[in-house]
């Protein structure tokens, strides 16, 4: 469950390392975002000479949460850290590589590009 002020790791090679959620998109008073949801983020920590600079604002899709996601068979997939992938205005990933596993729930949305780039799909 990601809400405003939550900090997340970045799971792509866009250059950002840590981002902070500044808005959960979808609905006027929507409070929480889960895996597969789009959020607005601000870059808090970035590597030098990268595409994403500190202070930049991007859209991002949540790919891993500590809360996890419940499957129809009753199993729950949880992760140790919260992570997101930065997106451009067309909701395409900025980076060309994805680090760490992602869940199958991203396949249902418009994020097949992220699923195909990920090293492991749970």
From Swiss-Prot:
Single GO term (MF): large ribosomal subunit rRNA binding
SMART domains, per the entry: Ribosomal_L14
Gene3D superfamilies (alphabetical): Ribosomal protein L14
GO CC entries: cytosolic large ribosomal subunit
Pfam families, A to Z: Ribosomal_L14
Keywords associated with the record: Ribonucleoprotein, Ribosomal protein, RNA-binding, rRNA-binding
InterPro entries: Ribosomal_uL14, Ribosomal_uL14_bac-type, Ribosomal_uL14_CS, Ribosomal_uL14_sf
NCBIfam families named among the record's database cross-references: rplN_bact
Protein family according to the UniProt entry: Belongs to the universal ribosomal protein uL14 family.
Assembly information from the UniProt record: Part of the 50S ribosomal subunit. Forms a cluster with proteins L3 and L19. In the 70S ribosome, L14 and L19 interact and together make contacts with the 16S rRNA in bridges B5 and B8.
Record-given protein name: Large ribosomal subunit protein uL14
Organism expressing this protein natively: Shewanella baltica (strain OS155 / ATCC BAA-1091)
